Amino acid sequence: MPLNANFPSKNYDYDYDLQPCFFFLEEENFYHQQSRLQPPAPSEDIWKKFELLPTPPLSPSRRSSQSSLFPSTADQLEMVTEFLGGDMVNQSFICEADDEALLKSIVIQDCMWSGFSAAAKLEKVVSEKLASYQASRKESALSSSSPCQSQPPPSPLKSPSCHGSLSLGGTHRSSHGFLQDPSSDCVDPSVVFPYPLNDSISNASSPCQDLILETPPISSNSSSSESEEEPEDEDEDCDEEEEIDVVTVEKRQSASKRVESSSHSQPSRPHYSPLVLKRCHVPIHQHNYAASPSTKVDYVSSKRAKLESNIRVLKQISNNRKCASPRSSDSEENDKRKTHNVLERQRRNELKLSFFALRDQVPEVASNEKAPKVVILKKATEYAISLQEDERRLIRETEQLKYRKEQLKQRLQQLRNFV
């Protein structure tokens, strides 16, 4: 027969199933139903206005037998959570047991709005329920640590660790007698609450908690479905995962060995010393303006000799660079820059010498040793044009002379014939 949601049941375990869905028009009915289940606190109506949905439980309730007179530990825990709102108590279980200030913060909302009498009552109830819960936690931890130590350690990548393998017989037995078995024999509280509440519990079940912290908490559906699987499949999965780990470790070791071998083999290579380009001295000649005109021929010949020596040095440097070993990019750039500077100096010196030679050929600026390059070019152009005119004039004169010569030869021949 289905239970009616309007009337609360006598059994406390079915209260989560009786909570209706929250709709906009059913808000007053929902709060009215909660007031029937338990007496409201003085400030409960104020806090209900700020809530939307009831907080769901973290784990499914393990229902005890209806014939038992005394409720189990899980039932007492649910009574405390539902009496205090559920949300803040569940947050306090995650914290350490020594943090009593955080546990006392449960009654902060009632202390703000109501008097100290309600706060004292709530503190008393919470302290009693938490003391009983911690005692049951110690007993369950001691009982769960013994099968964990007897079993071999499973693979670290397998999420259902020793808590999931407490006893397969117990899980099958709980499926037959669901309402007759107590909750502590079926579910370990550390599966639902992965964080330890006491130092003694953490020390007792340290090898099991290390495996739990690596994976997220196991839900009730996943634990029940995994308990139905065969142990042979689990062993095969563990073996496959262990093989994968061994392969990865061997690959890492081989890679590290290769790096070490390469580091040892590097000093055996011949060390190539970088080629250093010697700076050749290219003299920047300044014209001796105070010298006499008779020294110009010697000056030009000495300049040509020095330029030839500089060209020889540059050829030697280029040959050495071709025969040298490869170098780094920085040294190559420096060498190229130095070579470019040397060649640029040589080009400038050759250009200056050519201007000096051109100036000596132009009669108008030959005596002016301080003549600028622009004046030298203009005078040289004019002098070239005048030379071309003289050449054409001389060509015409030679042609006239040739014609006159032919005429004289003919006259001489006529005179010889008359004689």
Swiss-Prot record:
Domain of life of the native organism: Eukaryota
Motif (9aaTAD): 78-86
SMART domains xrefs: HLH
SUPFAM superfamilies reported for this sequence: HLH, helix-loop-helix DNA-binding domain
Leucine-zipper: region residues: 387-415
Subcellular localization: Nucleus
GO molecular function: DNA-binding transcription factor activity, RNA polymerase II-specific; protein dimerization activity; RNA polymerase II cis-regulatory region sequence-specific DNA binding
Domain bHLH: 335-387
Compositionally biased residues, Polar residues: 319-328
Segments for region (Disordered): 141-166, 206-274, 319-344
GO cellular component, one term: nucleus
Single GO BP term: regulation of transcription by RNA polymerase II
Ranges of compositional bias, category Basic and acidic residues: 248-261
Keywords noted in UniProt: Activator, DNA-binding, Nucleus, Transcription, Transcription regulation
Biased composition annotated in UniProt, kind: Acidic residues: 226-245
InterPro entries per the UniProt record, alphabetical: bHLH_dom, HLH_DNA-bd_sf, Myc-LZ, Myc_transcription_factors, Tscrpt_reg_Myc, Tscrpt_reg_Myc_N
Assembly description: Efficient DNA binding requires dimerization with another bHLH protein. Binds DNA as a heterodimer with MAX.
Domain notes: The 9aaTAD motif is a transactivation domain present in a large number of yeast and animal transcription factors.
Protein task: Transcription factor that binds DNA in a non-specific manner, yet also specifically recognizes the core sequence 5'-CAC[GA]TG-3'. Activates the transcription of growth-related genes.
Protein name (Swiss-Prot/TrEMBL): Transcriptional regulator Myc-A
Underlying gene: myc-a
